[in-house]
Every structure is written in C-alpha cells, then in structure tokens.
C-alpha cells in the first residue's frame, strides 16, 4: 500500500502562486474588456501592473535557488570525491614514509627534567639584598653595642672585657655598604671605652671601609644614648632597651628591638628579633 507524501513548503508556495496568477489573469481579462477600460483610472492600472510584476519576481526567486542547487550538486560531489581521494593518498604516503620515532630513555628524561628544574629554581637572595630590602633603602642607621654587637650585656661587664660577636660581622659589613652606620654605648669609664674600640678593631670592623672610630659614640647615661639618636635622626635604630624604643617610636621611622621575648605592646614601626642576624636572615 503506497504511502501518501505531504507536499513540501515549496510546492505549496508554487501552487499558491499559480492560483494567484490565474486569479490575476481572470481579473485582468475582465478589467481590460471594452466596458471596464473606460471606468479604469491610472491608479488602478498601476496597481494591477505592480501586482503582476511582484508575482513574476516571486516566482523567479523561488525557482532560481532550486535550479542552482541542482546545477551545483554534481560539482560538490566531484569536489568531495577529489578531496577524499587526495586525503587518502596523503595519509597513505605519510604512513609509508614515516619512520618509527626514537623513544627516549628514562635517564634522558630525568636529565632533561633536572635541567629544567635547575633553570626555573628560584634564586636565593644574597645577604646584601636582604639587608637592603629590610632597611627599606634606609641611608642612616644607629645601633647600640651591648647585647647586639658585643657578647656583653651590661656596662659592668665592659670594665673586664669586650668581645665582638663573630656572627654579626657579615651583617655589619653589608649594613655599612648601603647605610651610614653609627655605633653607641653607655660606659662607666674610659678604660671600658678603650676596650670596646680595641675589640672592634681586632674584629676587623674598621678595615671594611664603611665604619671609622669617629662613628663609635660613648655616653654615661641611657638618656645620653637617646639624645645621640635624636640628634642623628636615623632611618633605623637598633636597641635592646624597650623604654628607649618606646620613647623613640615617635621620632624614628623604624626600629629593631633585640630581645629574646617580644614585648606585649610595641609601636607599629618597631620590629622585634632575637638578634640582628636573625632579623636579616643570616642565621
């Protein structure tokens, strides 16, 4: 039993245009009769002519794409056949001419990976770079001696001896490269002052070129050390006395408070570390 196929949209449009054409032809034949022509004006004739032209162009617009598709289909088929055959020939030639790739050994892969890892490994900054970064381009630094540069922690101990901490020498050298460094301390007598200068000279502090004996200042009271700092107006001051750090916080841009235990309250511009070596990352 044959199945009835529904007409396509194009066929329906063609039928509609044919009916419209027949209707227009009938109307035109009746209008152009001898009795009707006399009653027509120029507007009616123009409307009829426009309708006829519209029907003709609509018919050509519907008919032309179908004919063009029918004419172009063989070319597409031929082009697709040529393309597929060319692709097949190219793939066969590639398979025929290709040589089995060399397989790298695990040792070679590991060696290449090691080179890549070493190349992209982050570079560790030098001590000089760390000092300069921590000081924030500070051009002048003041620092007390007891408990920071010297092993001794009180003026009474300086009456017996003065010992420079060996671990601080490298940091001192880097600080003197970038900043104007002043050392200061409270002493009880002239003999203590001489012992301190001799200890610094024996440690090679004055031979580096950045520090001279004239930049080592002595006083007899803690207030005297505070006055030194206020007069010099450094960018950084390093001290172990929390009271002095608190007093100078309003006047000095940055301070480093050296202490084993961090104070409960410190100003925002006061940093705390167990030693200057630890603060600058040299230990």
Curated annotation (Swiss-Prot):
Any one Pfam family match given in the protein's UniProt record, by short name: HAD_Pex22
InterPro entries in alphabetical order: PEX22
Membrane recorded as keyword: yes
Swiss-Prot/TrEMBL GO biological process terms: peroxisome organization; protein transport
Primary site of residence: membrane
Comp. bias (Low complexity): 81-100
Keyword annotations of the record: Acetylation, Membrane, Peroxisome, Peroxisome biogenesis, Protein transport, Transmembrane, Transmembrane helix, Transport
Topology relative to the membrane: Single-pass membrane protein
Compartments, as annotated in UniProt: Peroxisome membrane
Gene Ontology CC annotations of this record: peroxisomal membrane
Transmembrane segments: 45-62
Residue numbers bearing the N-acetylalanine modification: 2
Location of the region described as Disordered in the Swiss-Prot/TrEMBL record: 66-107
Claim: Cell membrane is one of the keywords in the record: no
Coiled-coil positions: none
Subunit (UniProt): Interacts with PEX4.
Sequence similarity: Belongs to the peroxin-22 family.
Function field: May be tethered PEX4 to the peroxisome membrane and may be involved in a late step of the matrix protein import. Does not play a role in the biogenesis of the peroxisomal membrane.
Protein's name according to its UniProt entry: Peroxisome biogenesis protein 22
Species for this entry: Arabidopsis thaliana
């Amino acid at each position: 039993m044959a199945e009835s196929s529904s007409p396509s949209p194009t066929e329906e449009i063609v039928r509609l245009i044919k009916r419209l054409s027949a209707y227009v032809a009938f109307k035109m034949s009746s209008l152009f009769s001898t009795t009707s022509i006399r009653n027509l004006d120029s507007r009616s004739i123009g409307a009829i002519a426009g309708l006829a032209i519209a029907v003709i162009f609509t018919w050509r617009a519907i008919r032309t794409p179908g004919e063009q598709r029918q004419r172009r289909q063989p070319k597409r088929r031929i082009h697709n056949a040529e393309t597929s055959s060319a692709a097949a020939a190219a793939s066969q030639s590639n398979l025929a001419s290709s040589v089995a790739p060399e397989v790298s050994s695990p040792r070679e892969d590991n060696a290449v990976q090691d080179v890549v890892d070493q190349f992209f490994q982050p570079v560790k900054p030098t001590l000089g770079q760390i000092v300069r970064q921590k000081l924030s381009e500070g051009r002048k630094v003041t620092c007390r001696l007891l408990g920071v540069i010297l092993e001794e922690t009180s003026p009474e101990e300086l009456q017996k001896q003065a010992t420079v901490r060996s671990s601080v020498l490298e940091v001192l050298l880097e600080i003197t490269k970038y900043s104007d460094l002043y050392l200061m301390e409270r002493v009880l007598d002239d003999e203590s002052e001489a012992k301190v200068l001799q200890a610094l000279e024996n440690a090679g502090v004055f031979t580096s070129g950045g520090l001279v004996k004239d930049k080592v200042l002595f006083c007899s009271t803690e207030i005297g050390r505070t006055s030194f700092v206020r007069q010099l107006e450094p960018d950084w001051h390093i001290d172990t006395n929390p009271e002095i750090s608190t007093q100078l916080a309003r006047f000095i841009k940055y301070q480093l408070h050296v202490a084993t235990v961090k104070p409960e309250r410190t100003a925002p511009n006061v940093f705390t570390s167990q030693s200057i070596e630890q603060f600058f990352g040299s230990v």
